[in-house]
């Protein structure tokens, strides 16, 4: 397989995007949103073909599944992107040097962005809308689990692009096989940035094999620390929401850390989890506090593997600590640097937590479920970065632009 011709076509299409006015881009985005709704039956029928090949018990199943409601949400997100100001051509810095040169630093597209993702067909729409709005061409490399869905979505997008006389190569879907992934990771000279979205195994593979820049959107091993000064009602609501709102996403709660002085509150903190049949892997102290108060079939002794696991399922761990410092230590050891939360009524404790915890998103008395581009007012997200360069946290339009310097003068030469 040689995809260089495909990569070159995407690159060429990307150069023309820079010439599209923002109002034209917004028209295209709104048309794609409308097409997604008009072709709901087609998209869902193709999605069902993917679902039929996967067990409903697979943690990826919920991510893979599209519904009419989810497609309405996707269309709404695309329309929201259209309402956002263009991230391009913004003056980031300007100055006049002593010799009269005028320097202007302006935002520009990356060029071509490659996205490697697994069983999440909604990503195809998200990536397209953000890349179009930011003037980037995009190469989609979806997993085989979602191949029917991704092909249907890209076909819907291409239909709209053709209506607007836009080169359809601006969004290209690669074959769903590993050889295509390897070629994409080595597309030096064609692709400017790779963003992997998926399991830690996928992200590690991309990091270890790519010869072009990568922004990691790491696994979400998320903790909520119920502090000795925590409010029980708030804690119960936050834990339930963070764990059960949607278990298959990266901002879902994986481990509750509880101060030993509040072990007697554990039954109340976990009460709402019973209805969702959440399996709890509890350390000895937490197990003893929950025994007789939580269904025996759902309460398991924790093992070393219980901590540091992204469950993506109706499962979570509980760790007991005897100090705030030990809570920080546990997070430091097991966190994926995605989203961490504290439940406390002590302002000093909250401030110290936000300063000391090294994560992209740090919450005080808030569910980690809010780590999301739309919730942050970004319209949508191309991923949630857990690294510190070039972006961190939910990545919206600004995070998928770069910049260049424009230098204007009147014949200046350097001595």
UniProtKB/Swiss-Prot annotation:
Its EC number is 1.2.1.41. It catalyses: L-glutamate 5-semialdehyde + phosphate + NADP(+) = L-glutamyl 5-phosphate + NADPH + H(+). It comes from the Bacteria. It is found in: Cytoplasm. Keywords: Amino-acid biosynthesis, Cytoplasm, NADP, Oxidoreductase, Proline biosynthesis. Catalyzes the NADPH-dependent reduction of L-glutamate 5-phosphate into L-glutamate 5-semialdehyde and phosphate. The product spontaneously undergoes cyclization to form 1-pyrroline-5-carboxylate. This is Gamma-glutamyl phosphate reductase. GO terms for molecular function: glutamate-5-semialdehyde dehydrogenase activity; NADP binding. The keyword Cytoplasm applies. InterPro entries: Ald_DH/histidinol_DH (IPR016161), Ald_DH_C (IPR016163), Ald_DH_N (IPR016162), G-glutamylP_reductase_CS (IPR020593), Glu-5-SA_DH (IPR012134), GPR_dom (IPR000965). HAMAP family: ProA (MF_00412). One of its GO terms (biological process) is L-proline biosynthetic process. Belongs to the gamma-glutamyl phosphate reductase family. Pathway: Amino-acid biosynthesis; L-proline biosynthesis; L-glutamate 5-semialdehyde from L-glutamate: step 2/2. Its main location: cytoplasm. GO terms for cellular component: cytoplasm.
């Amino acid at each position: 397989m040689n995809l260089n011709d495909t990569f070159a076509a995407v690159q060429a299409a990307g150069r023309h995007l820079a010439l599209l006015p923002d109002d034209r881009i917004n028209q295209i985005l709104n048309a794609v949103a409308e097409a997604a709704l008009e072709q709901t039956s087609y998209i869902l029928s193709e999605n069902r073909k993917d679902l039929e090949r996967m067990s409903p018990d697979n943690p990826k199943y919920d991510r893979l599944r599209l519904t009419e409601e989810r497609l309405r949400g996707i269309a709404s997100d695309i329309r929201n992107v259209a309402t956002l100001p263009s991230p391009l051509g913004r003056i980031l810095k300007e100055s006049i040097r002593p010799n009269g040169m005028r320097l202007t630093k302006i935002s520009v597209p990356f060029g071509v962005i490659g996205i490697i993702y697994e069983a999440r067909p909604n990503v195809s729409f998200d990536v397209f809308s953000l890349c179009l709005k930011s003037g980037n061409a995009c190469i989609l490399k979806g997993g085989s689990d979602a191949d029917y869905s991704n092909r249907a979505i890209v076909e819907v997008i291409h239909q709209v692009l053709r209506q607007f006389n836009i080169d359809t190569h601006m969004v290209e879907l690669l074959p769903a096989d590993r050889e295509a992934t390897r070629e994409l990771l080595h597309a030096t000279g064609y692709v400017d940035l790779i963003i992997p979205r998926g399991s830690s195994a996928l992200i590690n593979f991309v990091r270890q094999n790519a010869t072009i820049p990568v922004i990691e959107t790491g696994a979400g091993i998320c903790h909520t620390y119920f502090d000795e000064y925590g409010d029980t009602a708030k804690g119960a609501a936050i834990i339930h929401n963070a764990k059960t709102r949607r278990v298959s996403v990266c901002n879902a709660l994986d481990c509750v850390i509880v101060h030993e002085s509040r072990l007697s509150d554990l039954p109340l903190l976990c009460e709402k989890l019973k209805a969702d049949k959440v399996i709890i892997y509890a350390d000895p102290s937490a197990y003893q506090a929950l025994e007789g108060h939580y269904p025996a079939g759902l309460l398991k002794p924790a093992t070393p593997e219980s901590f540091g696991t992204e469950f993506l399922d109706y499962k979570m761990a509980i760790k007991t600590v005897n100090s705030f410092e030990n809570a920080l230590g546990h997070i430091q050891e097991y966190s994926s640097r995605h989203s961490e939360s504290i439940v406390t009524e002590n302002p000093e404790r909250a401030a110290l937590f936000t300063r000391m915890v090294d994560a992209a998103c740090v919450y005080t008395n808030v569910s980690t479920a809010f780590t999301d581009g739309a919730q942050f007012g970004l319209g949508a997200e191309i991923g949630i970065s857990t690294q510190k360069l070039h972006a961190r946290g939910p990545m919206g339009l600004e995070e998928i632009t770069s910049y260049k310097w424009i230098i204007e003068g009147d014949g200046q030469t350097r001595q």
